[in-house]
Design a protein with these regions (language model features):
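Extracellular carbohydrate-recognition regions
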Residues: 18-42, 201
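Extracellular glycan-recognition surfaces and repeat-rich motifs
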Residues: 31-63, 73
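Short, solvent-exposed beta-strand-to-loop segments that form ligand-recognition rims
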Residues: 163, 168-189
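Short, aromatic/His-centered strand-loop micro-motif at the edge of beta-sheets
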Residues: 134-157
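Secretory/extracellular carbohydrate-interaction modules
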Residues: 29, 65-134, 193
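Ligand-recognition surfaces built from glycine- and aromatic
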Residues: 20-23, 182-208
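Short tryptophan-centered beta-strand motifs in secreted/extracellular beta-sheet-rich domains
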Residues: 24, 89-91, 152-167
Length: 208
């Protein structure tokens, strides 16, 4: 493992060409990490910021979404300077609270705020769901019941190549699926839903 300048990005030698991890530890609390873009699909205003958490997977910092938005609104935060067509994206996430949802997930092949893929876990529903967001309309492609515990760190990983998508949760294969809605390269990042307050750490990505 090799730490690059500012300690923000950790280069990983195995698993994928040019694989990297962002741990948010060199970003000032209250700010967004460099080269990240935050927004929301739907009405409302997301609140993304780096914040300290001593329980972080790689302490001291995490990326947190704490905005309270409408039930059919989806806050996202993407690393805008990457473009992945085939590869993987992974993250550790901790759902903290939410009356309607306690969700955390990853997005990939992100074209804009209305067009991208999502895989997420939800501590209120105890499931993992693969979605596509096309023209601002979310559609569930496949879902699997799995235990997602609130206030606990979990890992989520998606491998994608062509139309094939493979999702793993806490080190276990959750699902495999095929979809051809988005085939072009795009950005990748993290995602929540509605009133979910969720923390993220060790965001990892790589191309193949």
């Amino acid at each position: 493992m090799k730490r690059l300048a500012l300690g923000l990005v950790v280069a990983l030698a195995a698993g994928a060409a040019g694989a990297e991890t962002v741990n948010f530890d060199s970003t000032k609390a209250g700010a967004l990490p460099p080269s990240w873009l935050a927004g929301i699909t739907g009405p409302g205003r997301a609140q993304w910021a780096v914040t300290p958490d001593p329980t972080a997977a790689s302490a001291p910092n995490v990326l947190k979404q704490s905005g309270q938005v409408a039930s059919h609104s989806y806050p996202w935060c993407v690393k805008k300077d990457i473009s992945l067509q085939n590869g993987f994206v992974a993250v550790k996430f901790k759902p903290l609270s939410g009356q309607e949802d306690q969700a955390g997930g990853v997005v990939w092949r992100w074209q804009d705020g209305d067009n991208y893929y999502i895989a997420r876990g939800n501590a209120l529903e105890n499931n993992i769901i693969l979605f596509r967001m096309a023209h601002g309309q979310r559609k569930a492609l496949h879902r699997v019941p799995m235990t997602v515990t609130g206030n606990q760190w979990h890992s989520l990983r998606v491998d994608f190549s062509g139309s094939h998508i493979s999702v793993s949760f806490d080190g276990h294969k959750a699902m495999e699926w095929d979809d051809q809605t988005f085939t072009k390269a795009g950005a990748a990042g993290v995602w929540t839903k509605a009133d979910s307050v969720t923390e993220f750490d060790d965001f990892q990505y790589g191309s193949r």
